C-alpha cells in the first residue's frame, strides 16, 4: 500500500514538472500581443536578433521593444495596453495569461529607458498582485489603472498616475528598496533617484495629459531632465 502511494506521488510530481516545462516553452514561443500602433522607427530584439516592428507584428515573451524617432502601441492578449514613446526600451520579463486562473496569470514588464504608458488589462483584474512593473530604480504595484513612467540614462524614474479610458482613477504603489508611496489622484507624480533613495512625496502635475506626452516624449531622455520638470512644472494640488 505504501509503495503504491509513493508511486502515485512520484507520478504526480513528474506530471507537474512536465506541465511547468511545457508551459514555459509555450509562453516563450507563443504570441502574447500585437502591435496596434506603429509610427517612425521601432524594432524588437528577440533571442539576440533585432528586427523592425510593423503594424500587426507579433509580440512574444522576453521581447525587448525599442523605439528611435517613433512610437509603438501594443495590446496584449489579456487586453493590457502599453504605449512605448520615442527613444524608449520596454522589456517583457514574464507573461502568462489564463483567464480561468488568478494564480496562473502573471505580467512583469521593465521600462529600461524613455517613456512608457500602461493601462491595466484582465491580468490585473484577476489578481493585481500578479502585475509587476519595474524601472531600474522603482517597482510599481498596479491596482487597476493607467500611469506613465519616464526613465533617464542613469535609471532615475518619474511615475505619473493617469485617468483610465473611462476617466476614472485607480491607484498605484511606487517603491524603492527603502521606501514606498501611494498615488491616488489623477496626474499625481513621484520620482525615484536610486533604489537606495525614498520615492519623493507625491505632488500633482499642473498639466493635461497631452502636455505630459509632449514634454516627456519629444526628445531623448536627458540626465536630470525629470528633476527639472519636477522643480519647474509640478506644484501641489490647489485646495
List where the protein language model places each region.
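Short beta-strand segments in beta-sandwich/barrel cores
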Residues: 41-43, 72-74, 89-90, 116, ...
Amino acid at each position: 500500500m505504501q509503495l503504491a502511494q509513493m508511486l502515485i506521488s512520484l507520478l504526480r510530481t513528474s506530471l507537474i514538472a512536465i506541465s511547468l516545462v511545457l508551459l514555459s516553452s509555450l509562453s516563450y514561443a507563443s504570441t502574447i500581443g500585437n502591435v496596434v500602433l506603429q509610427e517612425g522607427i521601432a524594432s524588437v530584439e528577440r533571442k539576440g536578433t533585432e528586427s523592425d516592428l510593423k503594424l500587426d507584428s507579433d509580440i512574444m515573451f522576453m521581447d525587448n521593444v525599442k523605439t528611435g524617432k517613433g512610437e509603438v502601441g501594443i495590446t496584449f492578449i489579456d487586453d493590457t495596453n502599453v504605449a512605448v514613446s520615442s527613444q524608449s526600451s520596454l522589456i517583457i520579463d514574464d507573461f502568462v495569461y489564463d483567464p480561468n486562473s488568478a494564480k496562473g496569470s502573471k505580467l512583469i514588464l521593465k521600462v529600461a529607458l524613455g517613456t512608457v504608458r500602461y493601462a491595466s488589462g484582465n491580468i490585473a483584474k484577476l489578481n493585481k498582485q500578479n502585475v509587476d512593473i519595474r524601472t531600474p530604480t522603482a517597482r510599481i504595484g498596479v491596482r487597476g489603472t493607467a500611469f506613465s513612467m519616464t526613465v533617464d540614462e542613469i535609471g532615475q524614474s518619474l511615475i505619473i498616475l493617469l485617468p483610465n479610458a473611462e476617466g476614472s482613477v485607480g491607484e498605484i504603489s511606487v517603491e524603492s528598496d527603502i521606501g514606498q508611496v501611494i498615488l491616488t489622484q489623477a496626474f499625481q507624480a513621484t520620482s525615484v533617484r536610486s533604489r537606495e533613495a525614498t520615492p519623493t512625496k507625491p505632488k500633482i502635475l499642473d498639466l493635461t495629459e497631452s502636455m505630459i506626452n509632449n514634454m516627456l516624449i519629444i526628445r531623448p531622455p536627458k540626465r536630470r531632465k525629470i528633476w527639472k520638470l519636477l522643480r519647474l512644472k509640478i506644484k501641489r494640488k490647489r485646495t
